[in-house]
UniProtKB/Swiss-Prot annotation:
The keyword Transmembrane helix applies. HAMAP family: NDH1_NuoA (MF_01394). It catalyses: a plastoquinone + NADH + (n+1) H(+)(in) = a plastoquinol + NAD(+) + n H(+)(out); a plastoquinone + NADPH + (n+1) H(+)(in) = a plastoquinol + NADP(+) + n H(+)(out). GO terms for biological process: photosynthesis, light reaction. Its EC number is 7.1.1.-. InterPro entries: NAD(P)H_OxRDtase_bac/plastid, NADH_UbQ/plastoQ_OxRdtase_su3, NDAH_ubi_oxred_su3_sf. It is found in: Cellular thylakoid membrane. Keywords: Membrane, NAD, NADP, Plastoquinone, Quinone, Thylakoid, Translocase, Transmembrane, Transmembrane helix, Transport. GO terms for molecular function: NADH dehydrogenase (ubiquinone) activity; quinone binding. It comes from Synechococcus elongatus (strain ATCC 33912 / PCC 7942 / FACHB-805). Belongs to the complex I subunit 3 family. This is NAD(P)H-quinone oxidoreductase subunit 3.
Length: 133
């Protein structure tokens, strides 16, 4: 069981936590502030409104047309290829920063990674996934 000592330290069996009072206070306050603000907003909000609350709000104007518009699949293909190469950049940046310290094995691993992505790009290009027409 935990007990407080006279020198403001919390003792859990063998472990003594000394000087963590500020951290405990910070955690307590940072937990209470969002809980209290959400509770206050729930208590002070206006009552529920009628059917106009369920309508779509679009820049203060009545919405024109339906919300479900079909996009051409080409947009998705370009977005998918972009995301793949964007993730490649995210993975290669730390490798490039630490290139001098990593050695030959890391170079070979990065080369294999880039080769797999280039093969995927060639496959998408050959299948016509990058053609706009």
């Amino acid at each position: 069981m935990a007990k407080w000592n006279s020198d403001c330290s919390l003792e859990f069996g063998v472990f003594v936590l000394n000087g963590y009072e500020y951290l405990l206070g910070f955690l307590l306050i940072s937990s209470l502030v969002p809980i209290l603000s959400l509770t206050a907003s729930r208590l002070l909000r206006p009552g529920r409104r009628g059917p106009e609350r369920r309508t779509t709000y679009e820049s203060g104007m009545e919405p024109i047309g339906g919300a479900w518009i079909q996009f051409n699949v080409r947009y998705y293909m370009f977005a998918l290829v972009f995301v793949i190469f964007d993730v490649e950049t995210v993975f290669l940046y730390p490798w490039a920063v630490a290139f001098n310290r990593l050695g030959l094995l890391a170079f070979v691993e990065a080369l294999i990674f880039i080769t797999i992505l280039v093969v995927g790009l060639a496959y998408a290009w050959r299948k016509g996934a990058l053609e706009w027409s």
